[in-house]
């Protein structure tokens, strides 16, 4: 039960972070409070960091908000493709 609650809190914090209501530092402080400074806490903080620096909301090769494609259309007129959590203009996935 405690693991499920921790996962639920973590997912809630990620959802709030993606809406730009909180910054990365405050979410990592909440992780330290709820999970602690252990292996699981470090993993959670690494995921938050990776998602926080994700400018175009690319998650697992999926453009969740179509902001990658919009950015590439404005910047170079090419289609935007998500490569993991990175946005690349005019470079489709090769796999």
Curated annotation (Swiss-Prot):
Residues 55-95 form the BetaSPN-type CS-alpha/beta domain. The keyword Secreted applies. Keywords: Antibiotic, Antimicrobial, Disulfide bond, Fungicide, Secreted, Signal, Toxin. Residues 1-19 form the signal peptide. The keyword Cell division does not apply. Disulfide bonds join 58-82, 68-87, 72-89. This is Opiscorpine-3. It comes from Opistophthalmus carinatus (African yellow leg scorpion).
């Amino acid at each position: 039960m405690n693991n499920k609650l921790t996962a639920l809190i973590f997912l809630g914090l990620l959802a709030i972070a993606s809406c730009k209501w909180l910054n990365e530092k405050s979410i990592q402080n909440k992780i330290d409070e709820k999970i602690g400074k252990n292996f699981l806490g470090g993993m959670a903080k690494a995921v938050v960091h990776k998602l926080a620096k994700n400018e175009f909301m690319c998650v697992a090769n999926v453009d969740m908000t179509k902001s990658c494609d919009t950015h590439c259309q404005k910047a170079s007129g090419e289609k935007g493709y998500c490569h993991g959590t990175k946005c690349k203009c005019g470079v489709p996935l090769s796999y």
